[in-house]
């Protein structure tokens, strides 16, 4: 574990949190997965498309889904709706402004590129303190 992640983990108390990663960029998805795992978060995915995310949802019930809003040219609004229907908190990540996200029910929006510190803050925002482990 990197010293940065170790220091954050000591304060994060996000152990056993289950997060679904939905990101079409292999590099971003793997970096995100590695960072989450360093924080002792259980990671499902990454999924590169809404269909892949749906298949993972059939197998697991994540607490939070981190979703890139634009997945290979397909906007993820329908997936976000389905995640909300299942009680999964959604964090949208995007490399550009997407005004339509304001119309979606999301716990938070994280602008790419983002730091480990920003990711941790967003996860804390997405999970109320009463539910943090």
Where on the chain are the PLM-derived regions?
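Non-catalytic signal-transmission and effector/linker regions of two-component phosphorelay proteins
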Residues: 1-18, 51, 115-133
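Conserved acidic carboxylate
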Residues: 23
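Two-component/phosphorelay signaling modules centered on CheY-like receiver
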Residues: 26-45
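Acidic, metal-coordinating helix/loop segments flanking the phosphotransfer/catalytic sites
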Residues: 46-64
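Acidic catalytic/metal-coordinating carboxylates
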Residues: 49, 75-78
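Active-site residues of response regulator receiver
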Residues: 68
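Hydrophobic/aromatic residues positioned on beta-strands within the core alpha/beta folds
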Residues: 93-94
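A Lys-centered signature of the CheY-like receiver
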Residues: 112
């Amino acid at each position: 574990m990197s010293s940065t992640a170790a220091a954050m983990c000591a304060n994060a108390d996000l152990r056993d949190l289950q997060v679904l990663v939905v990101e079409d960029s292999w590099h971003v998805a793997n970096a995100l997965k590695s960072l989450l795992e360093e924080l002792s978060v259980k990671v499902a995915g990454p999924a590169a498309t809404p269909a892949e995310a749906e298949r993972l949802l059939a197998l697991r019930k994540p607490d939070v889904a981190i979703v890139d809003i634009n997945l290979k040219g397909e906007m993820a609004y329908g997936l976000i709706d389905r995640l909300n229907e299942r009680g999964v908190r959604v964090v949208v990540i995007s490399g550009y402004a997407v005004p339509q996200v304001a119309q979606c029910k999301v716990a938070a929006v994280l602008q790419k590129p983002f730091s480990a510190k920003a990711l941790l803050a967003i996860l804390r925002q997405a999970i109320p303190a009463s539910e943090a482990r």
